[in-house]
């Protein structure tokens, strides 16, 4: 479903299948010193979804209405405990998947 995967990143082996009929919520922990790539894919494109990254206190750190194929890189200065919340905005979505990958952050000179 996610053609090309996450080149250059180590893929999280857990499968994150998105429920196309309701919100999907995933607990995540992100560590300092890494770059994380999050990618959303659907079988039918373009499909619209809302992506939210929320910290453990419920504060929204990032939100965006997106289309399938979206990816974004994140880096964290401190240990991040939170949730990824995916809201389907398109009733035509049949199958959707979330990929999370990581790689060691390059050291700055």
Question: Residues of each region from the PLM?
Answer:
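Acidic, Ser/Thr/Pro-rich low-complexity intrinsically disordered segments
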Residues: 16-97, 104-109
